[in-house]
């Protein structure tokens, strides 16, 4: 299977859409894999790899304001996904798989089939949702202002009802209004399947009073593996040690 970085995808306004691509031998179809708000293409590589193992070319891409995309967060998010879908048509039919905001964009796209994972179907999140988007979700986003995402969500057109195979996925412990919105939307679609994920769900429970003061440190710890600075520092160090430094075996057996 071939794996490569893609640099030739161009959005409607001329910006490059950075992407990684898996290409199985003899593939006749492809899937654009799109992250949610605050994510990046690297976070979607696991899903893309599993899709590629099923014989489909899989392209994980960065939306503007995220990852290596050169443009700041703005209203052209769907342009980035559409440019990726158009580019992938060289392989044949094209699907779109997206999470959260990426799932909403996938449902708005021209893809032949769509898998939307916990899609953000509401344009007006709850107070709790707004707080998470502004205070937590946008840490890695290059945005004109912390609340730009709220303006973008409000400006999105209604999610279209399209007659195509559509998979809608939510977690059993997902956000309740999101689950209701997903199931209501599924009822309006001609060819929709709904899947509920039950494994590896966080369970509700009481928290100690000091948890909010600890939360930012925990989130920084969890997010480090997907930090763009880590993507530069760790690979560079490893390559320097293994490919450029003098070779030498380390005796791990001990005396």
Predicted regions and their residues:
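The alpha/beta-hydrolase serine catalytic core
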Residues: 95, 104, 108-254
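Conserved alpha/beta-hydrolase
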Residues: 48-68
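The serine-hydrolase catalytic nucleophile loop
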Residues: 37-49, 180
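N-terminal cap/lid segment of alpha/beta-hydrolase-fold proteins
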Residues: 1-26
């Amino acid at each position: 299977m071939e794996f490569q970085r893609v640099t030739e995808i161009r959005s409607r306004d001329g910006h490059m859409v950075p992407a990684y691509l898996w290409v199985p031998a003899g593939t006749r179809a492809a899937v654009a894999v799109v992250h949610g708000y605050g994510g990046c293409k690297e976070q979607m590589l696991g899903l893309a790899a599993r899709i590629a193992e099923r014989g489909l070319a899989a392209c994980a891409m960065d939306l503007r304001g995220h990852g290596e995309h050169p443009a700041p967060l703005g209203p052209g998010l769907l342009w980035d996904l559409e440019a990726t879908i158009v580019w992938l048509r060289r392989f044949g039919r094209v699907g779109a798989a997206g999470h959260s905001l990426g799932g909403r964009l996938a449902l708005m796209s021209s893809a032949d089939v769509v898998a939307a994972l916990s899609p953000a179907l509401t344009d007006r999140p709850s107070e709790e949702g707004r707080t998470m988007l502004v205070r937590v979700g946008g840490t890695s986003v290059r945005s004109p202002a912390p609340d730009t995402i709220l303006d973008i969500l409000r400006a999105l057109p209604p999610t279209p009802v399209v007659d195509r195979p559509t998979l809608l996925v939510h977690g059993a412990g997902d956000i309740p209004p999101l689950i209701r919105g997903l199931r209501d939307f599924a009822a309006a679609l001609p060819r929709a399947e709904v899947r509920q994920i039950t494994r590896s769900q966080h369970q509700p429970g009481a928290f100690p009073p000091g948890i909010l003061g600890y939360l930012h440190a925990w989130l920084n710890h969890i997010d480090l593996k997907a930090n763009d600075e880590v993507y530069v520092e760790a690979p560079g160090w490893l390559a320097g040690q293994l490919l450029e430094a003098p070779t030498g075996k380390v005796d791990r057996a001990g005396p």
